[in-house]
Amino acid sequence: MNNGDTNRETDSTTRPNQDIIRESSGRTSPSEQCSMVANTSRKREWSHGGRGTMASIAKESQENFQYMAEELEKMGSEFFGYVTGQSIKPSSAYISDVIILRDIQLRDQCLDVLREYGRSRRNGLFGFSEEGDHIHVIHDCSYTNRSCRDIWISQVKPFGSVQKTGKPVKFIWEFKRTDWYDVFIYFFVRKRGERAIYVRGESGKIPSNDECVRWTREFKEREMVSSSDCTDYYECEQQEHKISRRSDAGSSNGRLYEKKAYSAGKFAYIRKKTKALLRKYYVSPVSAICDVPEFRDDDLLCDPKNRDYIQAACDDFGKDLNAMSLREIYNLLTEDYNFTDEQELNPYALFISSMKYDNLENSLNIIIELLKFQCNDDEDLIVEFLTNLVNVLDRRIPKLNAFLIISPPSAGKNFFFDMIFGLLLSYGQLGQANRHNLFAFQEAPNKRVLLWNEPNYESSLTDTIKMMFGGDPYTVRVKNRMDAHVKRTPVIILTNNTVPFMYETAFSDRIIQYKWNAAPFLKDYELKPHPMTFFLLLSKYNITF
């Protein structure tokens, strides 16, 4: 068993005659938390090889060291398999950062971003451990030009500030095995919050609650492990950021930062104000809220430095909408208005758009005229059409996630569906999926509905489109960002031409198809139907939503 030698012969002070660490399989959930850990009182950090490090334990007792090393290997087999293996680059740097959250309520969103990044990182090590109002992040990095350019740093900016630990960057070739033990103990054994390790994008094993309890019982009682959270190279981030353990009645976790992080501060205000305006002015797309005069009159909202906060608030509002059914959206829009009252037939103040809407009465009349024309004046066909549309939009039927209309030009397809897109707001448009467009589906993530106008795709994407039309989760490439996960999102397809998925058997249960005819009478209408017309239409034909 190795008592502190480097995994590469780079240090002249290595100690001989030690065994190779054994590997262990077995997995536990990364979400399990360590409820009992070593005493977390902050003490003065010790010099290298001093008290509280695995190197010091190796000096004191080889038997104790071997036992502890074996236990650590069992608790983090993937972690140690990578850092002591041949695939890790000696020239890479070990980076340790701390995310100071601006608001504790942003913690889960920030953790989701870190998990998604960890899954998408196809090389190297990435891990994090959460401690309430801050999150520790570690990873190996090429450290080009002596700087880390990993994209997760910019992705977490809306949630807090990324701070360095204050220690000089250390390269992989400088690490001894005992150093890696100390890293694992500090970040993944002693931490109480959410923890995760990713090796080449695959989730690695972390200590379970039982393992942490056993570690505490076996080693804390014997005082084999110091209560210090720090070693020479991994100084406690809490000390670096001046966290005090003094009890504070005004702090939920009893910690005080010398440089106070925002608590319901600027970002919380911006998010609250932006979402309030988005409820007052129903704009499409959501980001168009920046053009509303009331938004532009607010100096804080208009500050270019707060652009990321505004985008994060808009994304958050979009997620609220994405989880809503048609009925919930209707309730949201009718809290302050009675849209069936003749005096409220034209509530323009709610809907802000680049196009001008007709009033609800005229809008309803023209939409009914269009549907009667396309359904041969058959009310049963109109009811069937609207019922199928609601089933797709509300994701009611498993594997049925696409609604298609094929017609000649000027049939009223966009005229009808612009009303729905204006209502749902959070919609994305799919592009032409060919070898020249690698990001055709980049607008698919975090949307309430998707529009695919005049679809065209290569056969290699057939399986992805099957998942899309069947409501299965899938991943898409996004320009200048990591790959994004897409949950079930309804797809509206409008086309003038026949495309392969319209007649392939594999898609028959995934798509509802209708054929429309050219509607020349629509050229006499200059205004678009008001979005709220859709709800009046459903009520007229007794469609449940």
UniProtKB/Swiss-Prot annotation:
This is Initiator protein NS1. It comes from Junonia coenia densovirus (isolate pBRJ/1990). The keyword rRNA-binding does not apply. It catalyses: ATP + H2O = ADP + phosphate + H(+). In the N-terminus, the endonuclease region is involved in binding to the origin of replication. In the middle, there are the ATPase and helicase activities. The C-terminus probably contains a transactivation domain. Belongs to the parvoviruses initiator protein NS1 family. Residues 1-52 are annotated as: Disordered. It is found in: Host nucleus. Residues 1-12 have a biased composition (Basic and acidic residues). GO terms for molecular function: ATP binding; ATP hydrolysis activity; DNA binding; endonuclease activity; helicase activity; metal ion binding.
